[in-house]
Design a protein with these regions (language model features):
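Conserved catalytic cysteine-centered active-site region
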Residues: 1-11, 40-48, 55-96, 105, ...
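Beta-strand segments within the central parallel beta-sheet cores of soluble alpha/beta enzyme folds
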Residues: 28-35, 81-84, 109-114, 168-172
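Glycine-rich beta-alpha junction loops
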Residues: 37-39, 114-118, 151, 160
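Conserved active-site "lid/cap" helical segment
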Residues: 1-31
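Condensing-enzyme catalytic core mediating Claisen C-C bond formation in acyl metabolism
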Residues: 135-172
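Short glycine/serine-rich loop segments
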Residues: 97-117
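A short acidic, glycine/proline-enriched capping/turn motif at secondary-structure boundaries
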Residues: 15-16, 33, 38-42
Length: 172
């Protein structure tokens, strides 16, 4: 079984790849995966320390399995990297994807971020006094953040590659 963060990311990736009109990349070395996460396998870490102590949980704790599982799921053969940079990890993964495209190192990069709710990030943000004591209310003057979980993925590709295959281009 997978950590919840990885499972969320695989679903987001599947949707992004399908939306892009792509599928299996056949190990193409010009297809890369960059995924970001604040905590990675926080749920597995939590399970391990709460008494489960299953050796398999240890392998799901780091951030590295996330991008590895995504790359395996689409058979990407290029760069596979995980970004661990708190709240900005997903955004940084998209910037990194753009850099790979601009540098000519990849034609297609699947990029995004994922995190599952667990006591690990909650405890960290609580110790920083970063959590809002009130419920989430967009467009108000809050005094902190409200944590949640989710994943998002986008397919970033060179203009030439997208144009050549007749892709729907959302932005340039």
């Amino acid at each position: 079984s997978l950590d919840r963060a990885t499972a969320l990311c695989l679903t987001a990736t599947s949707e992004a790849v399908a939306d892009a009109g792509l599928s299996d990349f056949g190990g193409n070395p010009r297809v890369s995966v960059i995924m970001g996460s604040c905590v990675g396998g926080g749920r597995s870490l939590e399970s391990y320390y709460r008494g489960g102590k299953q050796p398999a949980d240890v392998l799901k704790m780091p951030i590295s399995p996330i991008a590895n599982h995504v790359a395996e799921s689409v058979h990407a053969g290029g760069v596979v990297t995980n970004v661990a940079n708190a709240c900005a990890a997903g955004t940084i993964s998209i910037a990194y994807a753009s850099d790979l495209i601009r540098a000519g190192k990849a034609d297609v990069v699947i990029a995004g971020g994922t995190d599952a709710f667990s006591s690990v990030p909650y405890s960290g943000f609580l110790s920083l006094h970063a959590l809002d004591e009130n419920s989430c209310s967009p467009f108000n003057r809050s005094h902190g953040i409200t944590l949640g979980e989710g994943a998002g993925a986008v397919v970033v590709e060179s203009y030439e590659h997208a144009k050549a295959r007749g892709a729907h281009i959302y932005c340039e």
